[in-house]
């Protein structure tokens, strides 16, 4: 189950919507009390009501979360490492586009407008567009998840 001096992952139950606040309070407590053995505080965006701690053991985690506002306790057991890797790994979001494609912007200030792809910056998850419906050449950078392919 728990191995000494190993990095284990513990899920802390928190009030929904307060995950970032709890993570910030945990970070502050770790810094002010100079607590060793905590390696990471993870706030999973797709797992509401939980904060994950990477720590050496329960003997460090339990006193750390004691008295933290909006922290409701520990979830039973350890989280498997492969589950944590799924949570923290970056997934490519949005459609696959290439320069020259005509796309429609589906959210943001340019919602509903047609645009042509100039370049794709996959590392940033963004695409540079030339808005076709403007009176003058207008280039904007938009996240990939805010576009939908119209024509290739």
From Swiss-Prot:
SMART domains: KOW, NGN. Signal peptide: none annotated. Gene3D superfamilies: 2.30.30.30, NusG, N-terminal domain. Coiled coil: none annotated. InterPro entries: KOW, NGN-domain, NGN-like_dom, NGN_dom_sf, Rib_uL2_dom2, Ribosomal_uL24_CS, Spt5_arc, Translation_prot_SH3-like_sf. It comes from the Archaea. GO terms for cellular component: ribosome. Residues 99-128 form the KOW domain. One of its GO terms (molecular function) is translation elongation factor activity. GO terms for biological process: regulation of DNA-templated transcription; transcription elongation-coupled chromatin remodeling. Pfam families: KOW, Spt5-NGN. Keywords: Transcription, Transcription regulation. Stimulates transcription elongation. Belongs to the archaeal Spt5 family. Heterodimer composed of Spt4 and Spt5. Interacts with RNA polymerase (RNAP). This is Transcription elongation factor Spt5. The lineage of its organism: Archaea, Thermoproteota, Thermoprotei, Sulfolobales, Sulfolobaceae. The gene is spt5.
